[in-house]
């Protein structure tokens, strides 16, 4: 399965580089390649902590639910919209533990971006499988997820 890892992004003229390992961002660097943050990945592939001393925990669907000292809470609806956010702030790993761009709210799934506000991808399926090339998890995110942006999987 191909993966199209994004190696950098530019927001308001500021470039950030990303280093990936096993489908996870493990480090981010500024435009001069100074490390901004480093993430520690657990054996299950989820981000456990970062170099800023934040600790993360997840629910059964892989959604980030607690930050730093477990006094913060985030709750998502089935499509990935935050319904409650107390204290996690700008942690980039949210819905299904996937990298979420704070600027757009889009979830980066390696091959496509997912928009929780519409429950669909913002570009058509590059494989062009099925009838709805923008659909996320065949409209059933309770029982599935799509970590690659190419095809849904049962959770």
Where are these regions (language model features)?
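A motif-centric feature for acidic-aromatic and gly/ser/thr-rich catalytic loops and repeats
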Residues: 52-110, 134, 138-151
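Acidic glycine-/aspartate-rich tracts in secreted/extracellular proteins
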Residues: 13, 129, 140-142
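Beta-strand elements of repeat-based all-beta scaffolds
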Residues: 5-10, 24-30, 46-49, 63-68, ...
């Amino acid at each position: 399965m191909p993966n199209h890892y994004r190696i950098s992004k530019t927001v308001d003229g500021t470039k950030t580089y990303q280093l990936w390992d096993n489908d996870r961002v493990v480090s981010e660097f500024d435009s001069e390649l100074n490390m901004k943050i480093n993430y520690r990945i657990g054996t299950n592939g989820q981000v456990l902590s970062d170099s800023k001393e934040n600790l993360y925990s997840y629910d059964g669907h892989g959604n980030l639910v607690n930050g730093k000292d477990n006094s913060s809470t985030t709750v998502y609806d089935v499509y990935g919209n935050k319904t409650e956010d107390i204290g996690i702030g700008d942690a980039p790993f949210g819905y299904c533990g996937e990298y979420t761009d704070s600027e757009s709210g889009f979830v980066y799934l390696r091959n496509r971006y997912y928009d929780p506000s519409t429950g669909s991808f913002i570009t058509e399926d590059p494989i062009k499988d099925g009838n709805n090339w923008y659909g996320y998890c065949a409209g059933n995110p309770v029982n599935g997820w799509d970590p690659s942006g190419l095809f849904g999987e049962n959770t």
